[in-house]
From Swiss-Prot:
Residues 263-324, 439-501, 530-591, 628-690 bind DNA. It comes from Homo sapiens (Human). It is found in: Nucleus. Residues 427-439 have a biased composition (Pro residues). Residues 263-497 are annotated as: Required for interaction with NFYA. InterPro entries: HD, Homeodomain-like_sf, ZHX_Znf_C2H2, Znf_C2H2_sf, Znf_C2H2_type. Homodimer (via homeobox domain). Heterodimer with ZHX1 (via homeobox domain 1). Heterodimer with ZHX3 (via homeobox domain 1). Heterodimerization with ZHX1 is not necessary for repressor activity. Interacts (via homeobox domain) with NFYA (via N-terminus). Interacts with EFNB1 intracellular domain peptide; the interaction enhances ZHX2 transcriptional repression activity. One of its GO terms (biological process) is somatic stem cell population maintenance. Residues 263-446 are annotated as: Required for repressor activity. The modification Phosphoserine is found at residues 825, 827. This is Zinc fingers and homeoboxes protein 2. Its main location: nucleus.
Amino acid sequence: MASKRKSTTPCMVRTSQVVEQDVPEEVDRAKEKGIGTPQPDVAKDSWAAELENSSKENEVIEVKSMGESQSKKLQGGYECKYCPYSTQNLNEFTEHVDMQHPNVILNPLYVCAECNFTTKKYDSLSDHNSKFHPGEANFKLKLIKRNNQTVLEQSIETTNHVVSITTSGPGTGDSDSGISVSKTPIMKPGKPKADAKKVPKKPEEITPENHVEGTARLVTDTAEILSRLGGVELLQDTLGHVMPSVQLPPNINLVPKVPVPLNTTKYNSALDTNATMINSFNKFPYPTQAELSWLTAASKHPEEHIRIWFATQRLKHGISWSPEEVEEARKKMFNGTIQSVPPTITVLPAQLAPTKVTQPILQTALPCQILGQTSLVLTQVTSGSTTVSCSPITLAVAGVTNHGQKRPLVTPQAAPEPKRPHIAQVPEPPPKVANPPLTPASDRKKTKEQIAHLKASFLQSQFPDDAEVYRLIEVTGLARSEIKKWFSDHRYRCQRGIVHITSESLAKDQLAIAASRHGRTYHAYPDFAPQKFKEKTQGQVKILEDSFLKSSFPTQAELDRLRVETKLSRREIDSWFSERRKLRDSMEQAVLDSMGSGKKGQDVGAPNGALSRLDQLSGAQLTSSLPSPSPAIAKSQEQVHLLRSTFARTQWPTPQEYDQLAAKTGLVRTEIVRWFKENRCLLKTGTVKWMEQYQHQPMADDHGYDAVARKATKPMAESPKNGGDVVPQYYKDPKKLCEEDLEKLVTRVKVGSEPAKDCLPAKPSEATSDRSEGSSRDGQGSDENEESSVVDYVEVTVGEEDAISDRSDSWSQAAAEGVSELAESDSDCVPAEAGQA
């Protein structure tokens, strides 16, 4: 209770509005000598003298309250818990407590009026009751204030179990203005268990029984009995516990009575220090059967003990709900209506109905505070507007009974409290905007995009493995349990014939999603939390989008430029690009998922209708998620070769392959995506003639030459007999010029390397090759025009500088020849497909 110094500090337990009576100082302390047993009556004077001697010999009765270890005496110093006052004189300290803190019970004593039994420990009183009053539960406790001593007198009543706080003095007698308590069916009356093993008693703690007369009978430690109203036994531990104290509200006569059985045979005090039990009670005071079973296994205690423990804790905290109210509170709690603020938990008791005045409910009669665990407070709340406050060590929250919910957050209110000027009132925080209640994960409605991802995965496998589940978690943002439940439900529906998920229905869904996106205001981040980008203006987003089209990984110079133009920090720009890349990859992956990973290699032989549907799907998705690219950029022969090589291997590259192609070719990613889309359309009509050649040469290197091509060209170069016709025939047949064949041509025509090259057709202008490449954007058969330039470049191993220029000349000549040969045959192959792009 108090700070540890070289003396024990008197137990200070708060009471409320207890009137101090001018009783003669005939009683001060009770001397502890042994275990109390009933003894014959002694005179009142001898008893008073004994108490006075006790107060001199043993200045302070040591108190153990709710897990607080025994205090040691340190040089006779005393320190007040509730204010900075400290002194080395016990009398001055007690006077200070009585005058400055009138609501504190100091060194209470217990007495049994039936047997004249006196003790200072509640354990001794419990042992006495179990021995001499077995099976008796109708006890009446009367609190008497006598100078510096508080007396709790126990008597047996035949009707109700009443705990009342009274005052004794001239003219008052035994007035019963207290907390009346009736019997409860929750806990069976019985004998309390005194666990001597867990709470060993020291010799100085052993108390003798003393005999008193009239109402001046002393009982034990009020802090203990009030903190253990249900017979709870205290342990010497360091965990925080709830320590209620008696406090009379102004409307004490209107407050209903709460049953607090003092004797029970099944209460297990060891559960008071069990962290699992405490956490479970803090979450919800009414455990379900499943929770009880789990707690039984976790705590290694019988289920009946756990039930009794929960019932006692509810009595302590004034929680008494009907089954309907429990169900309602549980639903609201798990539906997310409780917005938890970490240091405070407010427990509101049941609403008082006019017809149920006799319902046993505790209403602020026993306000509680947590000792040793300041981050968690359970506070009683009255049915009226009474404000409950506590010391600065703990945080108490008060409020008004809410008709709609039983455990909401209640805004603390500051109210004057004349009896406790030293207590810090809880300030009222500014009002917060009410958020709509969150729905549980199982009840959240999935978006069309999430369902499309789930259906695409469902088509591949109705029993997804862990890798697929994790991928769906990243793509859809759903929880693992939601994904598992969705798959389970749809497996059941498919087996019963309720739903039929096919590729056609998936394609329709994707088209509908794309159309809805295209129809509404452009928002490039549908799958991400809006708060990440809500602070960016449209102008900032446009600047970022333009930069993203150029490169998804901006350079340092580009980042500096964006920081200047958008006024955003580097972290914000990096985060935006990261989310934008993630969105782009997810959209591309969605196209792959919609057609199934096992179908990627079968697109060539697929029906035209299926390919058309997939192309429409991919086109709609990509055009809706990606802004319109810049005008077509002419590609070099090397870039075209790399694209064709990848296209021959897979017509649907993964996002990683797109990144690799962008790095190798230097092209913008959107251009690469568009090129693949157009060539898939051309492949559908069967007009991509270079496809077969690339498929037959899987081992070709990145430079476009392989052994097969070289062997095919050599015989053609050697066949002509007339040396003057060698070069034109060589070019006419293979339409290629290999560097290693150049020497053979030179020897046959008996000319140098330069004349041999002059025999080839003239080099076309650069604009011709640009036009032939740009024609692919207008649907004029670009891929067939590019067929003649399959060989992009050859790796030069000779030392002549002119060999490189020879190679470039041959490429341009081949491209010009290909334009003239294929312009007519392929002019009608793509108008419709190019128009879709």
